[in-house]
């Protein structure tokens, strides 16, 4: 039995799932929006919110945690520079998931996750 299933498994082993979420988080912060499956979009939403909350904190420890998670060092510095101005008055909910048409090959539910 799976009591307290907090993390969607996304059909992958733990190491591949963590790498996928890190890559999607990095790409979403870089480009502002990413088209992916609905399950992946919902899973990456909490990771993106966590990174933006760290950036709003702005401390050295928060910066080091973000550098340890995201793949692009320059992107982390840019996020920390603009997060307070862009998200200063918002208490969470930094991204939205918009459903789109299903994927043609396997009929998977697709979504666009974008930063607010």
UniProtKB/Swiss-Prot annotation:
- A Pfam family matched by this chain, by name? Ribosomal_L17
At the top level, the lineage of the source is: Bacteria
The record ties this protein, via InterPro entries, to:
Ribosomal_bL17, Ribosomal_bL17_sf
Keyword vocabulary terms for this entry: Ribonucleoprotein, Ribosomal protein
* Gene Ontology terms for molecular function: structural constituent of ribosome
Gene Ontology CC, one term = cytosolic large ribosomal subunit
Q: Could you mention a single GO BP entry for this protein?
A: translation
Per the record, the similarity remark reads: Belongs to the bacterial ribosomal protein bL17 family.
Q: What is this protein called?
A: Large ribosomal subunit protein bL17
Where would one find coiled-coil regions in this protein? Answer: none
Q: How does it assemble?
A: Part of the 50S ribosomal subunit. Contacts protein L32.
């Amino acid at each position: 039995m799976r009591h307290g299933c907090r993390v969607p498994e996304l059909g992958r082993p733990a190491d591949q799932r963590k790498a996928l979420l890190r890559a999607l988080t990095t790409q979403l912060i870089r480009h502002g929006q990413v088209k992916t499956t609905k399950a992946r979009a919902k899973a990456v939403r909490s990771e993106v919110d966590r990174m933006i909350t760290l950036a709003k904190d702005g401390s050295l420890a928060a910066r080091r945690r973000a550098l340890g998670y995201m793949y692009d060092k320059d992107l982390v510095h840019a996020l920390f520079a603009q997060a307070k101005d862009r998200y200063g008055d918002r208490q969470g909910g930094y991204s939205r998931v918009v459903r789109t048409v299903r994927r043609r090959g396997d009929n998977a539910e697709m979504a666009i996750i974008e930063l607010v």
